[in-house]
C-alpha cells in the first residue's frame, strides 16, 4: 500500500492551561484548605480553532485518500488557557 503525502494544514501546539481541583474530604485543619490550589496542565495536539471564547485542538488524525479525519478533540474555554506554544513539526 502506497503512503499518501498529505500535509496536515494545522500547527502542532502545546497548550498550558489551568484546571480546577476538588476534594470531598473533611478538613479539621483549615491550613490544609489554605494550601489547596488549582492544577497546571499541559496538552499537545494540533490547533483546530482559536477564538476569543474557545481553543480547540485534536491529537489524532488520518487520511483516507485526500479526506482528513480527526479524533481526540479537546475544547478549552479561552480563559483557562494561559499559553499556547507552537511546536516544531
Name each model-derived stretch.
Residues 2-89:
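Conserved RNA-binding domains used in RNP assembly and mRNA/RNA metabolism
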Amino acid at each position: 500500500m502506497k503512503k499518501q503525502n498529505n500535509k496536515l494544514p494545522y500547527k502542532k501546539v502545546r497548550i498550558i492551561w489551568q484546571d480546577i481541583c476538588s476534594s470531598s474530604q473533611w478538613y479539621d485543619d483549615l491550613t490544609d484548605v489554605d494550601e489547596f490550589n488549582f492544577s497546571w496542565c499541559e496538552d499537545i495536539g494540533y490547533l483546530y480553532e482559536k477564538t476569543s471564547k474557545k481553543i480547540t485542538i485534536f491529537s489524532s488524525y488520518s487520511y483516507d485518500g485526500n479526506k482528513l479525519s480527526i479524533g481526540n478533540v479537546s475544547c478549552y474555554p479561552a480563559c483557562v488557557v494561559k499559553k499556547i506554544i507552537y511546536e516544531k513539526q
